[in-house]
């Protein structure tokens, strides 16, 4: 048994050994196969990936080269580049004028949108002989860069690039009624110097509250002699008229390829695709358009735009931008006085084939479309337009007057101020008053600036109205010194936008949302003090709606105070019922209304602020309250700010200078916010 058991055991051991050996061999074979397959797959996969990777690298390289403005300047023989930061088109217009000036000095210039180029390329600019970078930089809102200059601003803040050898000059566009007057232009000028660039002429400060055109002309007439002296060049002659675009008339054009008012992509209004922005606005349906006031002297209105299915998101305090259309009667009058067929399909093509800007507005299109949707025909034209138009005045006196107004002489500046600006003469009025002035319509379309979007503070909260954006506006209409009646382009156009009726017609508004820093505090318990006379109440309707919504959600909400001003309670008390309802429900802690014309002595919002000075100081100093001011920048905002200086000085027992510093620190911390206009 023992032997049998031993034999049996031996046999079992051998069998186990054989099994172990068998599985080990199988494992090795399988492992080898797996490794082989994986290796082959990996190599195969890698090869397959190398093709798109290589293509991607080529694309990136090409893209980088396209964004090199220095390479473009070398290729096209230019040595002056004029960058513009523009929100309303004025800075871009000034940049174009400066780039055209260059030819008078044997130089070649180009205007450039900083958004389209890599500004790190500035360090390579000295590779071009007698190269100069000019910056026409507007300031938007409260010291912010314009949308197209935001990336440039961010780059300047982050970079430490050496700009030694770079020559530059800056002209800033701003408004002195704003707290941060010309902040962007001043920053660019200072920062470029810090990075080693050489300023060849003093910073220019344009003030739109005064005469921006005169500020620019005065700076420009001193700037070019400084450039000549620096580079050792001389002017080649008098300023001459040089066409930038050539006319092409289309006699047999497929209408499907013709622009009919789109801002960017052809047929974008027929085939709407997000995201929606300045170059791709959303066509919103007007669902509500009601008059807010009882009086007949002015028309104040509340509109609601449907943004369902647009994927547009907004927050209380944001702005809505709308693209208006010019009055068809004005357009028709222009066509008649120029003897032009407005329905001709045409294109204006840039004579500079290397330019990024192929057309002054979307082409091909008709003159009617251009004058209705693309060109500004209601603002007084600038001096460069008058200079170019003068050649078409056949009557010597009219020709002389136009050239004089376009000159930099004191007499010319005074005449332009009085005859054009103060009289608010638009292009049609000038053509009517100068009968011999009859320019070709295509040249006029080349000269007129682009019609710009108008911005309105959104008068709703997305928490309550996620599918609609509300606008509060006053229709502008006034008589000029010449007896003409001028109307606001956008507000008159909005006023006529009737909601869909029984006939099924829809009133549409091209729009997009622009983000703002005008925001409610992060903590709902933080008290808010809102000051907004007239249509300045608009963003506060959204703020109050949001605070009311938070209360309905069971959230604890801090004190909400509104200081609102209007003329009379029975004339222009906007959102009267809504505000009374919020006050009754407790969402609005205090509703303080100043009526400026209801009693012999005028009462303004600042008077009501002084009346509540003790409580306001407690909310600000102890409660961490946030202050918001919306409305007129020239008078109201300044007076309100001075009132807060007085309150802080008196209640905080401070000297005036200390009180000013206290309020300025509130601004720096985001506790004193402004949404103002002039």
From Swiss-Prot:
Q: CDD domains this protein is in? A: CYPOR
Q: Which UniProt keywords apply?
A: Endoplasmic reticulum, FAD, Flavoprotein, FMN, Membrane, NADP, Oxidoreductase, Phosphoprotein, Transmembrane, Transmembrane helix
Q: Where are the transmembrane segments?
A: 22-42
Task: Quote the record's binding site residues for FMN.
Answer: 86-91, 138-141, 173-182, 208
Stored InterPro entries: CysJ-like_FAD-binding, FAD-bd_FR_type, Flavdoxin-like, Flavodoxin/NO_synth, Flavoprot_Pyr_Nucl_cyt_Rdtase, Flavoprotein-like_sf, FNR_nucleotide-bd, NADPH_Cyt_P450_Rdtase_alpha
Cofactor(s) needed, names only, are: FAD; FMN
Which top class of enzyme applies to this chain? oxidoreductase
Question: Which residues, by range, are in coiled-coil regions?
Answer: none
Per the UniProt entry, the Enzyme Commission number(s) are 1.6.2.4
**Compartments, as annotated in UniProt:** Endoplasmic reticulum membrane
Protein's membrane topology:
Single-pass membrane protein
Q: Which residues lie on this side of the membrane: Cytoplasmic?
A: 43-678
Q: Which residues bind NADP(+)?
A: 298, 535, 596-597, 602-606, 639
Q: Which residues lie on this side of the membrane: Lumenal?
A: 1-21
The UniProt record lists the Flavodoxin-like domain at 80-224
Pfam families reported in the protein's UniProt record: FAD_binding_1, Flavodoxin_1, NAD_binding_1
A GO CC term assigned to this protein in UniProt? cytosol
Catalysed transformations (reactions): 2 oxidized [cytochrome P450] + NADPH = 2 reduced [cytochrome P450] + NADP(+) + H(+)
What GO annotations for molecular function exist for this entry? flavin adenine dinucleotide binding; FMN binding; NADP binding; NADPH-hemoprotein reductase activity
- Outline the extent of the FAD-binding FR-type domain: 279-521
Q: Which GO terms describe its biological process?
A: nitric oxide biosynthetic process; response to hormone
How does the cofactor attach, per the note? Answer: Binds 1 FAD per monomer. Binds 1 FMN per monomer.
- Which PANTHER family does the record match to this protein? NADPH--CYTOCHROME P450 REDUCTASE, NITRIC OXIDE SYNTHASE-RELATED
Q: What is the designated name of this protein?
A: NADPH--cytochrome P450 reductase
* Gene name of the encoded protein: POR
């Amino acid at each position: 048994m023992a032997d049998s058991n031993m034999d049996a055991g031996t046999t079992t051991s051998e069998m186990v050994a054989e099994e172990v050996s068998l599985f080990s061999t199988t494992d090795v074979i399988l492992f080898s196969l797996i490794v082989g397959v994986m290796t082959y797959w990996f190599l195969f996969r890698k090869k397959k990936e190398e093709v798109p990777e290589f293509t991607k690298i080529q694309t990136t390289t090409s893209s980088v080269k396209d964004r090199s403005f220095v390479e473009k300047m070398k290729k096209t023989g230019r040595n002056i580049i004029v960058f513009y930061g523009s929100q309303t088109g004025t800075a871009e217009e000034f940049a174009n004028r400066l780039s055209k000036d260059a030819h008078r000095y044997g130089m070649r210039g180009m205007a450039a949108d900083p958004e389209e180029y890599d500004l790190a390329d500035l360090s390579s600019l000295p590779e071009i002989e007698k190269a100069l970078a000019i910056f026409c930089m507007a300031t938007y809102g409260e010291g912010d860069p314009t949308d197209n200059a935001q990336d440039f601003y961010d780059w300047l803040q982050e970079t430490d690039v050496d700009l030694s050898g770079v020559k530059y000059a800056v002209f800033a566009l701003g408004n002195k009624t704003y707290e941060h007057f010309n902040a962007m232009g001043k920053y660019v000028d200072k920062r470029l110097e810090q990075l080693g660039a050489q300023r060849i002429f003093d910073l220019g400060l344009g003030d739109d509250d005064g005469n921006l055109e005169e500020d620019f002309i005065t700076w420009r007439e001193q700037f070019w002699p400084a450039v000549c002296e620096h580079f050792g060049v001389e002017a080649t002659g008098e300023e001459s008229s040089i066409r930038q675009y050539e006319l092409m008339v289309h006699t047999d054009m497929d209408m499907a390829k013709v622009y009919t008012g789109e801002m960017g992509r052809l047929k974008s209004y027929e085939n709407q695709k997000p995201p929606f922005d300045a170059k791709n606005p959303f066509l919103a349906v007007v669902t509500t358009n009601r008059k807010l006031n009882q009086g007949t002297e002015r028309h104040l209105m509340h509109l609601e735009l449907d943004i369902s299915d647009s994927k547009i998101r907004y927050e209380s305090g944001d702005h809505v931008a709308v693209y208006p259309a010019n009055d068809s009667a004005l357009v028709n009058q222009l066509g008649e006085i120029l003897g032009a067929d407005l329905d001709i399909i045409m294109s204006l093509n840039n004579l500079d084939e290397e330019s990024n800007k192929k057309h002054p507005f979307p082409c091909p299109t008709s003159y009617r479309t251009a004058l209705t949707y693309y060109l500004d025909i209601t603002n007084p034209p600038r001096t460069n337009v008058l200079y170019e138009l003068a050649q078409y005045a056949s009557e010597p006196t009219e020709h002389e007057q136009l050239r004089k107004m376009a000159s930099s002489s004191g007499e010319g500046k005074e005449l332009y101020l009085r005859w054009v600006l103060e009289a608010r003469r638009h292009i049609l009025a000038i053509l009517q008053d100068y009968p011999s002035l009859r320019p070709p319509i295509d040249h006029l379309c080349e000269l007129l600036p682009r019609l710009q979007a108008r911005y309105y503070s959104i008068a709703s909260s997305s928490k309550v109205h996620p599918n609609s954006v509300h606008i509060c506006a006053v229709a502008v209409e006034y008589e000029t010194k010449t007896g003409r009646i001028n109307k606001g382009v956008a507000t008159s156009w909005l006023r006529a936008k009737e909601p869909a009726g029984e006939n099924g017609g829809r009133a549409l508004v091209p729009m997009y949302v622009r983000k703002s820093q005008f925001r409610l505090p992060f903590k709902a318990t933080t008290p808010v003090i809102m000051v907004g006379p007239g249509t300045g109440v608009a963003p506060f309707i959204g703020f109050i709606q949001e605070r009311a919504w938070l209360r309905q959600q069971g959230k604890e909400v801090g004190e909400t105070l509104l200081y609102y001003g209007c003329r009379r309670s029975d004339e222009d008390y906007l959102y009267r019922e809504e505000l009374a309802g919020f006050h009754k429900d407790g969402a609005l802690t205090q509703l303080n209304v100043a009526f400026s014309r209801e009693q012999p002595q005028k009462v303004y919002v600042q008077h009501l602020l002084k009346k509540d000075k003790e409580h306001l100081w407690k909310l600000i100093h102890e409660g961490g309250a946030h202050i918001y001011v919306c409305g007129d920048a020239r008078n109201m905002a300044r007076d309100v700010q001075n009132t807060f200086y007085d309150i802080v000085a008196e209640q905080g027992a401070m000297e005036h200078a200390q009180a000013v510093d206290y309020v300025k620190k509130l601004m720096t911390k985001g506790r004193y916010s402004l949404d103002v206009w002039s």
